[in-house]
Structures are given as C-alpha cells and as structure tokens.
Amino acid sequence: MASADSNTLPRAPGDGDGVVISVDAMGGDRGPATVVAGMAESAGKNPGIRFIVHGPQAELERLIARRGDLAGRCDIRDAAGVVTMDDKPSQVLRKGEGTSMWSTLESVRQGEATAAVSCGNTGALMALSMLRLRKLPGVNRPAIACLWPSRNPQGFNVMLDVGADIRADAQDLLTYALMGASYARNGFGLERPRVGLLNVGTEEHKGRPELKQAHELIPTTAQAANFDYVGFVEGGDLPSARVDVIVTDGFTGNVALKTGEGTAKLVGELLKEAFGKSVMSKFAALLAMGSLKRLQKRIDPRRINGGVFLGLNGTVVKSHGSADATGVSAAIKLAFRLAQSGFQDRLAARVAQSVAAAGQINGSKESEAS
C-alpha cells in the first residue's frame, strides 16, 4: 500500500502533484452522469485531485469531455459490467470480476490510487473490499463509519459500526474505538477525540456482557492511542457535544442511523407543511428564510455523505446510492482528505497497537489466574 508520506502517494498518469482517487462511475441510482458531475465539482474545489474512473469507456469519455474541470485529470478504465443494487454479495464475489466496482478496488489494491469511492451496493462493496483488499492484521470485523450531525464545533460526530456486521464482541468494540478515533483525528483534525460506547444507560452495571468487557478494555489503550474515553453514552448523546466518536455494533448502529434519517425527513416535511398552511405562516417562513437555510445546510445529508470502510488494507468511501452531484463531491472530498493525511498507515498502526494491548491484558489475566 501507499506510504503515509505525501511525496509517495499514488499519482495520476502524466501528473506529478495530484493525489489519485479511484471512482466507480456505475451502480448509483442516478447513473454515471451524476458521478462525473460530482467529480467535476470536487475537482473545481481541490486542484490537487486526480481520478481513475471505472465504467463503459465510450460513455465516460463523452461525459468527461463536457466537464472542463476534469480536462487532463482523468484516466478511464473500461469496465462493462455493473453491480446492481439487487445483486447479492455472494453472487458478486463469484462473478464480480469485470465490473466497475471490482476495477475500482483493484486500482487501490495495485497502488495506483490511494482511496476508492463508490455509490454502489453496500453489501457487495464490503464483500469485494474484503476479498480484494483484505482485512488489516488484527481486525476480526471491519466497520462502516458514518457522520452524525451534532452540537460539536465540527458539526458532526463519528459513529461506527453502522452495518458492516451485526455482531461485535469486546475486542471488536475496542478495535472500533481505535479506528474511530484515528478516523476523527486524521479526517477532521481532532487532536484528542472523545470516544463513547453506546449502551442503554450510562451506569456501569447496565448492558450486555460484551459491552461491560469493552468498557474495561477501551480505557487501557486510550492514553497510548491519544483519545479520551468518556464511558457509556445513550442514544440521546448521538448528536450531543459530549462525545466525538460513538462505538457500537452494526445492528444497533444501523437502526440508529436509519431512525435518525427518518426523523430528519419527518421534521423537514412537518416544517414545510407548517410554513405553507396560511398567508401568515408563509410570511413567517420568508422572515425566517436565512435561519432556515443555515439549519438546512447544517443537517443537509449531502454535506456529510460518505460512509468509510475501516479495517481494510485500503481506504474505501461508500456514497449514498441516491446521492446527487453535491453528495458525490462530498464523498470524494472525504476520500481526498483521508488520502492526504496518510490515514491508512496510521490506522494500521493503531490496529496493531490494539492487538498488542489485548495480548498484554490477556497475558496478565492468565498470570493472575495461575
């Protein structure tokens, strides 16, 4: 894999300065035109970005030719196959070679690109990522990390896992804490992230056995891994300023994520109905327009689009399948930021640290038992 040294990051053909992002142009609900539009939007804001884009060559050449910001900054890899949202991960593992998703990950595996971005099928993308990139040594279960709007200065919190695996034992939760803290530090500049473990209450006697075990394990690595452990947190803390990283299993995290998305949609619909009921309410909406736009920007799901697959030998960012150009651009921006920070090598170091720490703890317990 590429070194964390920015001077040795993969470069696009013909360019000595750009960080390369591998992009799957197919698989999203809106088609390759939206993905290319998102690439152009991101390229206009980030002069140092270059792309290897995967999909039908003739179609991509036509779409890219219309975007001046992409001139000379793309290398197209022809891939006729497409992984659809209906494809099962098991089928993709057997027959996925030749698809744009497979080709996208292959560019990262071969060291041609630093990170991959795809709007495609989440289950298939995770399965192919584990097959082609492999798990980091010491990682039992990779995790998907998402961003949650919050009261923190950065505007959001990191939560993982949100659906990679419905199970997680104490060691998995410790690994998630280390990976989540590394992600928050390298992706968003938080020098010492605050990590919390999601539970049904903050009292130490509450929760399943694996949560209680993780509650004991996580503080043992916090100092060396440069994060603060705040203990158990509840659902109400997800958008709070008490914590920066929320650790949970994939089942709980996915339910929380989908509940949050549904609630945000409901609030938006109710506000729209309330401000449209009468002439006076429409006038009130006009007076509050500035504040409403600031609120909309703060909680706009497009702005925080991009779930990061953590625990693999490569950085993979999963964009929402229904993302528009702005959402795709946000996912690419996130991948670019992580690539620039040398995130992958730092993450590998943190995971290795967790394995060593767990070994020391287990060794101490065995000595005490004997």
From Swiss-Prot:
Catalyzes the reversible formation of acyl-phosphate (acyl-PO(4)) from acyl-[acyl-carrier-protein] (acyl-ACP). This enzyme utilizes acyl-ACP as fatty acyl donor, but not acyl-CoA. It is found in: Cytoplasm. Homodimer. Probably interacts with PlsY. InterPro entries: FA_synthesis, Phospholipid_synth_PlsX-like. Belongs to the PlsX family. It comes from Paracoccus denitrificans (strain Pd 1222). It comes from the Bacteria. Keywords: Cytoplasm, Lipid biosynthesis, Lipid metabolism, Phospholipid biosynthesis, Phospholipid metabolism, Transferase. The lineage of its organism: Bacteria, Pseudomonadati, Pseudomonadota, Alphaproteobacteria, Rhodobacterales. Gene3D superfamilies: Isopropylmalate Dehydrogenase. This is Phosphate acyltransferase. It catalyses: a fatty acyl-[ACP] + phosphate = an acyl phosphate + holo-[ACP]. Pfam families: FA_synthesis. GO terms for molecular function: phosphate:acyl-[acyl carrier protein] acyltransferase activity. GO terms for biological process: fatty acid biosynthetic process; phospholipid biosynthetic process.
